[in-house]
Amino acid sequence: APEGGWDMIIYNLGATKALNFGDFNRINFEYLRNFTEALERNKLMPQKFLYMSSLSALGEADEKNYTPIDSTTVPHPNTRYGLSKIKSEMYLETHPEIHWIIFRPTGVYGPHEKDYLMMIECIDRHFDFGVGYRKQLLTFIYVDDLVGAMFDALASDKTLHRKYIISEPRAYTQTEFRAIVAKALGRKAVVPIKLPLWAAYVASYVAEKWSHISLKPSTLNRDKFKIMRQRNWNCSVAEAEADFGFHADYPLKRGIEETVKAYLAEKAAAKAQK
């Protein structure tokens, strides 16, 4: 808008790993509060404000019957990251003058995303590491589908002051994920290695302590362990489908093919530079 408030703002700033809760709180909550207060103070509040939260804000789900996470799930975040996200959500809920929409995406993947890249690299080396022995249901959303959902939600007149889970509307097992990635990489032999929970916890604890010494946040930490330990990430996107016609154009197979294509191109470019 040339004068007054913005038409729309997508607030995607956030930290997914940090040295401590203080950093998570500062980046994920305080920055949001400061930003919205500045908008209000300068009379620049947008007509719609889309906040990118996370499925982790809801915490652990039903791991007995594997009931999908949905809009009725009561949040009880079990990670520092999830706690900082639900705190931000609660802040928005208590400020109706902010015309908020909240997205709770599941694991976002795509070219150049770092966490899933580590899993792809392992499978490229013929190994697939998993945590725990009980069945685990995983959900994913390809980055292009998430971006499309943002603009569809902003264009809808039904989304104001609503929260939406964003995911491809089906879950996968670790075995299915491994098979899809291996096929995209052209790897016929991949050895699955299951780490017991205690071993994964020890590795996460050591990596986190080292990050405190090096002052560099580690991808592997106790927060990440709790996420890896969680067995049920299955979720419902019924509200998003009903309110703004959400659909995923990239099922995991297609999204992984695009992600692997970018990974192999970067790998070839790095090899050519040596």
List PLM regions with ranges:
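Conserved C-terminal active-site "lid" loop/helix of NAD(P)H-dependent oxidoreductases
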Residues: 143, 179, 203-247
